[in-house]
Amino acid sequence: MKAVCWHGAEDVRVETVPDPTILNPRDAILKVTSTTICGSDLHIYDGFIPTMEPGDILGHEFMGEIVEVGAEVKRLKKGDRTVVSSIIGCGHCWHCNQQQWSLCDNSNPNSWMLEKIYGHGTAGIFGYSHAFGGYAGSFAEYIRIPFADYTATAVPKGIPDEKLLPVSDAFPTGYMGADLCHIQPGDIVAVWGCGPVGQFAMLSAYLLGAERVIGIDRFPERLQLARDFAKAETLNYEEVDVLEALKEMTGGRGPDACIDAVGMEAHGQGPEGLYDKAKQAIRLETDRPHVLRQMILACRKGGTLSIMGVYGGFVDKMPMGAAMNKGLTFRMGQMFGPKYIPKLVEHVLNGDVDPSVVLTHRLPLTEAKQGFEMFKHKQDQCIKVMFQPD
Amino acid sequence: MSQSIKVEKTVTIDKPAAELYSFWRQFENLPRFTRHLKDVRVISDNRSHWVITGPLDGTVEWDAEIVDDRPNELIAWKSVPGADVDNAGSVQFKAAPGNRGTEVKVVTVYNPPGGVIGNMLAKLFGESPEQQIGDDLARFKMLMEAGEIATNDGQPSGHSHSKD
């Protein structure tokens, strides 16, 4: 089959590789009908994610049709159309039972790698480095789905892929970002980053009862989408002082909750931005935490920071004094896929949400390299690139 | 005389002690989740024969006898005289608080011999026998909770194309 393999920073190649096979009784094989680049794939593309090996197949946001099931797959059958969670959970460990799917104890065969850097291993993720399990990704014609009964959710036929594809990863990630805010009546939620995850976080904040939502970015088309799709108010951080503007918009209180939908390659400004960029370039700091710092200062006293933007390693110059003395709550994590996916599928089927609006560009899988370049540099006002293997 | 090496490792498994105990008590099950233990053959109620494989198909073998057996709580075993390597081990099952399952603690002690067998064991267990026992226990947990051991052996990649 054809697959998109990583060979180093900014080096992805379409190659012919063997088809996947069932390796464990709870596996299924999926024919990928649609898959899309996630912002976190750019961290891999840019070479910031360790334990990648040349030849690894990328991709973790996808859907398709089940073509084969292992002996212990009970709920799914050949022919089922499914949306697949980017995060892999066994469904039987204590964490999965608590619905904390990304903390699964049993889905990461290379758990020991994470134990060394994080203290404990966490769940496997498709196409996201060997430390996260080394699972082959979805930028391929076929993919093996471990623990398929939980990792994949059956969806009806007759609704286009575009409307369901973001339910694999971007939508539940944004939804969890809002869910972690414990939104109360009257709450104002600010979201840093108006990419796909940020769009879904803003929209989800309203679904969960926010009074007002404010989106922060610098790209006009993304801010426009935040206004049109998520019905958010917007701030362009290149045009205004974000801290001042947020205070003015919230009666001086600051947003009740702040969501980070940006992550480790945040675009900082001024000397602070240069400092992080330089330190990250020579690997003295793995992540650029500009957004985190700003959220701590912006957030209402006693408010909540919800951190979804992916971080991998270390950050420095964190204003912990501000966080501590303002009594902030930090909540974060990789998304708990199967906890949210069925509910979000319902929202799509009911017509509450049309996630397809974030998918601005479609390419065949063979043009993956162009897709990455277009997405990375936001060419042609690109927000999200969808690949179709056929 | 070399010094004996003792390794202790604990994992919490979300299953009742009775289920974990009875799986472990059938020593033939152990090679299903241990990396180096190739075969355990039960000879009698409290005696079994254990085989470890090493590099170049070398093997280390011994007979072990059960020295303590408390159903659903503890199993302890010890190699009998004449073993390739003198060793002893135990596994203990203790309820974790608040319905968090069972804490499973493994203790192994062995006296590394010299010569060929000593070299082989050193290669097998490297500098971190704790890591090896920990990985074995992680696989035991996967098998008990998830019913299978997570793997990627045999999946596709473009690795074979990466050298051109």
Locations of the language-model features?
Chain B
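Hydrophobic ligand-binding cavity/cleft-lining segments
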Residues: 1-49, 53-55, 134, 139-164
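Intrinsic-disorder/low-complexity, polar/charged segments enriched in Ser/Thr/Lys/Arg/Asp/Glu/Gln
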Residues: 4-10, 47, 61, 74, ...
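Short hydrophobic interaction/assembly module
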Residues: 52-65, 69-72
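Short beta-strand micro-motifs enriched in acidic
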Residues: 43, 67-69, 92-98
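Beta-strand/loop substructures that line and gate deep hydrophobic ligand-binding cavities in soluble
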Residues: 60, 78-137, 141-142, 146, ...
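Short beta-strand segments that buttress and anchor functional surface loops
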Residues: 48-55, 75-82, 106
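Non-catalytic surface loops within mature trypsin-like serine protease
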Residues: 15, 54, 68, 95, ...
